[in-house]
Each structure stands twice: as structure tokens, then as C-alpha cells.
């Protein structure tokens, strides 16, 4: 095998993380990416949750600057980190499943010879399957996280027990169908846009953290904007049982349809776009961090 053939083989091996790569490499890379993404961007995510949930109460402020100022003054600078334990506990395993499933499906759907060509539909399908598997694991942790983001006086175990005792086990999965409705297109577009941008900016498929970061940011901004209405519905379903929710129609919303009607009745069509700015602000670096961390871990693990 000559030098050029060897170089191409190495690029295919790196980019695809093929089936013969150790399973633990795929899982560790995914777990590392998930923990980095969710922990570093957690305060912005918490702000997004509060902006969306502000519509579940009477006379609540919804501006980003006013919310940050109010939270810092009344609750302290660490208030927006409340609940990070829950998301770290869930993000590691969930993202391990997410990226591991993605690589597995991608390796089965796309032959090694076709890895250098643009395969948006197969990439999107791989991301969709990965999302269904990962969200089944992550949804309970996400529900607990959002309750903690609204009520900073509680702890992870106390909230978990409170949800189970007062609302039953099903409460951890009320938002699962909506989460899938949001995350399936998010993941499909995420993988498709990221891979497409990578093919454009990095046609050699080489390890390049700056390019990975750029492509991840482009993907994150686009996907966040497209899925904000579904994220608003998901927030209603996940925090409806919280004591901080005061509007009765919001408290009774336990299905996708009821949550949608509640938002529409209380806020009109604009209600589906609450939290758009912090969601985009959060997802640009979050998705960039996730992809860069994943590619970094994948590169390191494949070389070692």
C-alpha cells in the first residue's frame, strides 16, 4: 500500500470509527462529549428553562438580562448551576448510547468505500435511531433537572422521590413523546448538517478541532431555532407538577395536545417561541463542544 492509499485508509478509519473499533472507545467518546456539553452550558440551559417556565406563572419576567440579574441578586451566583448533578448522571450514559448507536448504525448503513462521499439520508437515519435509544435513558434525568432549575431549594434525590410519590413513575416519561418529536428532527438535522458542513470545510476528513467546532456551532444554531416550539411544549410537560407553576391549565397539561393548547391559550403563537434566544445561545457552543469533544476523544482513543 503506497503513502496516499495509507492516508486515505487512516482517514476512513478515523472518521467512521468502524465496527472493529473497541466498543468502549465509542462509549467513552460519547460519554465524554455528553458530560462536557451539558455541564459547561448548564447555566444557559437553566436560564432557558426559566424563561420558558416564566409563562407558567402570573406576571413573570422573561427577558434574558432581567432574568440573570434577578436570579443573581435573589438566589446567588450558583443558582443557575442547580440540578447539574442530575444532568451529569444522565448525560454520560445517554451520550455514550447516543454516539455508540450512531457509529454502529452508520457503519452498517454506509460501506467503508462510501464514507468519503456525502450520505445525508443515511447519516440522518443513524442519528434518529441513536436519539430514540438515548432519550429513553435520559428523559427521567432531564425531568428531574428541570424541576431543580425552577426550585433551587431541593436536591436530586428529594425531587426524584417527590415526583414518583406525587405523580407516579409515568411522570418521568410524560415528555418522552414530545422529546422524541423534538430530538428526532434535531438529531437528524444535527448529524446531517454537521456531516455536510464537515464535507464542505474539511473534505479530507482530517482531525481539526477548529473545523469540528465551527461545524458543530452551525448545526447547533440551526437545529435549536427549528425545534424551539417543541422544546417549549416539553418544558410544560416536565415542570407541570412543580410547586412553582401557578396557572391551572398549565398544571393540568399532561399530554402533547393539552400542553400545546395551554401555551396557545395563555400566550398565543408567540408562546411557542419563548426561550428562543437563550436556546440558540446555549446550543451554538453546546453542540460545538459536543462534536469537538467527541471528535477529540475519538481521535485520542483510536490512536491509543
Curated annotation (Swiss-Prot):
Record's bilayer topology term: Multi-pass membrane protein
Keywords: Membrane, Mitochondrion, Mitochondrion inner membrane, mRNA processing, Repeat, Transmembrane, Transmembrane helix, Transport
TM stretches of this protein: 23-41, 83-102, 120-139, 175-194, 209-228, 275-288
GO annotation, cellular component aspect: mitochondrial inner membrane; mitochondrial membrane; mitochondrion
Compartments, record wording: Mitochondrion inner membrane
Stored Pfam families: Mito_carr
Start-end of each Solcar repeat: 21-108, 118-200, 207-300
MF (Gene Ontology): ferrous iron transmembrane transporter activity; iron ion transmembrane transporter activity
SUPFAM superfamilies in UniProt: Mitochondrial carrier
Any one GO BP annotation for this protein: mRNA processing
Record carries keyword Repeat: yes
InterPro entries reported for this sequence: Mit_carrier, Mitochondrial_sb/sol_carrier, Mt_carrier_dom_sf
Keyword ATP-binding: no
PANTHER family in alphabetical order: MITOFERRIN-1, MITOFERRIN-1-RELATED
Family affiliation: Belongs to the mitochondrial carrier (TC 2.A.29) family.
Functional note: MRS4 suppresses a mitochondrial splice defect in the first intron of the COB gene. It may act as a carrier, exerting its suppressor activity via modulation of solute concentrations in the mitochondrion (possibly of cations). Not essential.
Note: Present with 1340 molecules/cell in log phase SD medium.
Name used for this protein in its record: Mitochondrial RNA-splicing protein MRS4
Organism for this UniProt entry: Saccharomyces cerevisiae (strain ATCC 204508 / S288c) (Baker's yeast)
Amino acid at each position: 500500500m503506497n503513502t496516499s492509499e495509507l492516508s486515505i485508509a487512516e482517514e476512513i478509519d478515523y472518521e467512521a470509527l468502524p465496527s472493529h473499533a473497541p466498543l468502549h472507545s465509542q462509549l467513552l467518546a460519547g460519554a465524554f462529549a455528553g458530560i462536557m456539553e451539558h455541564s459547561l452550558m448548564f447555566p444557559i440551559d437553566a436560564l432557558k428553562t426559566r424563561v420558558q417556565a416564566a409563562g407558567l406563572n402570573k406576571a413573570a419576567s422573561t427577558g434574558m438580562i432581567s432574568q440573570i440579574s434577578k436570579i443573581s441578586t435573589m438566589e446567588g451566583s450558583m443558582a443557575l448551576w442547580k440540578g447539574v448533578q442530575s444532568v451529569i448522571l444522565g448525560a454520560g450514559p445517554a451520550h455514550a448510547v447516543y454516539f455508540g448507536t450512531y457509529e454502529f448504525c452508520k457503519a452498517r448503513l454506509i460501506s467503508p468505500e462510501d464514507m468519503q462521499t456525502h450520505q445525508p439520508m443515511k447519516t440522518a437515519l443513524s442519528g434518529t435511531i441513536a436519539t430514540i435509544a438515548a432519550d429513553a435513558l435520559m428523559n427521567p434525568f432531564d425531568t428531574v433537572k428541570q424541576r431543580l432549575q425552577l426550585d433551587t431549594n431541593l436536591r436530586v434525590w428529594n425531587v426524584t422521590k417527590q415526583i414518583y410519590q406525587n405523580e407516579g413513575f409515568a411522570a418521568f416519561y410524560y415528555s418522552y413523546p414530545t422529546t422524541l418529536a423534538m430530538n428526532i428532527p434535531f438529531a437528524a438535522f444535527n448529524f446531517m448538517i454537521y456531516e455536510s458542513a464537515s464535507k464542505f470545510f474539511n473534505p479530507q476528513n482530517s482531525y481539526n478541532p477548529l473545523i469540528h467546532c465551527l461545524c458543530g456551532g452551525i448545526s447547533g444554531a440551526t437545529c435549536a431555532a427549528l425545534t424551539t416550539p417543541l422544546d417549549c411544549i416539553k418544558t410544560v410537560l416536565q415542570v407541570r407538577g412543580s410547586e412553582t407553576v401557578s396557572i391551572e391549565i398549565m398544571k393540568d397539561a399532561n399530554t402533547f395536545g393539552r400542553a400545546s393548547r395551554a401555551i396557545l391559550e395563555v400566550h398565543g403563537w408567540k408562546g411557542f417561541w419563548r426561550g428562543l434566544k437563550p436556546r440558540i445561545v446555549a446550543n451554538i457552543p453546546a453542540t460545538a463542544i459536543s462534536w469537538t469533544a467527541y471528535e477529540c476523544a475519538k481521535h485520542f482513543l483510536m490512536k491509543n
